[in-house]
Swiss-Prot record:
It is an enzyme of class 2 (transferase). Substrate binds at residues 44, 68, 90, 147. It holds the Pfam family SKI. Its cofactor is Mg(2+). It catalyses: shikimate + ATP = 3-phosphoshikimate + ADP + H(+). This is Shikimate kinase. Belongs to the shikimate kinase family.
Amino acid sequence: MIQPEEAERLRGVTVYLIGMMASGKSTLGAELAAQLRRPFFDTDALVEQVAGCSIAQIFAEQGEAHFRELETQVLAQLSGYTRLVVATGGGIVLRPKNWSYLHHGLTVWLDAAPELIWQRLKRDPGQRPLLQTPDPQAALQRLMQEREPFYAQADVRVPIHSEASPSQLAEQVWQAICARLRAQPPCNR
């Protein structure tokens, strides 16, 4: 459990979780926010609120470009606040404009192993528009290769190779954040 005085090391900086779909951003984000005693937001959930429909519907009816624009609008609004934990959509890193917002905080890449992501996705079929192809595993591999250079720009990288409880992962992420803060304290960018 993260102690309140430890959480103050962030100096009000928002934590943005980035990474592939099914890397655990939403589940871990909620746990990390609870331990840091901060509000939690999920950009995918906010996009669905703004659009009044599911992400799958947005993709089907208006296309990925429209979804990405809504995602950028949501991120722009969140970047105006401090002391948040934000789980982002897997593709948020693809737009340079989004990085200008992400740089208002500390970015943490949840670098989940490909086989772990695939196992999680198999338990939740049909909910990922970008994987609605004849070969979803190949599509996932392509997306991972395309996005990895963008994820690598994160302030902190946390490798995740096996299933762990949200509290264990939150501790792992917090330790990685603390190591980064020791090396380079935040300046409320």
